[in-house]
Amino acid sequence: MTRKLCSDPGVAFITGPRTEPMLWRRRIEPFTRPLVYAFFRFRRGLTLGVRAVVTDGEGRVLLLQHTYVHGWYLPGGGVERGETAETAVVRELAEEAGVRALSRPRLVSAHSNEILHPGDHVLVYRVEAWETCASNAAGEIHEVGWFHPHELPEETTRATRRRIVEALHGEESDPMW
């Protein structure tokens, strides 16, 4: 299967082959996810994650689908030990979406994800200048796409939709994820 990059003219998605391990992960994820979260909740009292709102020249927003969880999300992930949140969002963008930030990410909002994951906090950044680069998220990312904010896929999570509106339109952010 040919892999198309988001820098190719007229291409709205980066797609890759759906391999059997990815399908297997999607089938067992609903059962294993609560166990993994419970383990990390007791092992680490506080977790910090980052997400990025990135738009292209047409005003489309970058979203992605993971192989292990259903829905469309803003790119991002966890902040690693010894890493700043700003460094983490730049790293996650490159790893997951093949996007290299050319400008310093701007912090838009901070949220608690206490209801779903006690002790979890998420920082949302806006990246305005970027270029494509090689992604190394094989096995983790199923699909990457660019969507107009008013035409997001049906499977886009409610929190993702709220963060996009807050970041793009300057609306007051909800402190809860």
Feature roles, as predicted:
Residues T2-G16, H70-G71, A138-W177:
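Nudix hydrolase/Nudix homology domain
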Residues K4, G10-R51:
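Acidic, metal-coordinating catalytic segment for phosphate/diphosphate chemistry
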Residues V50, G77, R91-E92, F147-H150:
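Structural detector for helix-capping/boundary residues
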Residues V53, L63, V124-R126, W146:
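Conserved hydrophobic/aromatic beta-strand scaffold that supports enzyme active sites
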Residues D56, R60-E95:
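Conserved Nudix-box catalytic region and its N-terminal flanking loop in Nudix hydrolases
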Residues R100-S109:
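A short coil-to-beta-strand element that immediately follows conserved catalytic motifs
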Residues A110-A134, T160:
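Active-site-adjacent beta-strand/loop module that shapes the phosphate/pyrophosphate-binding cleft
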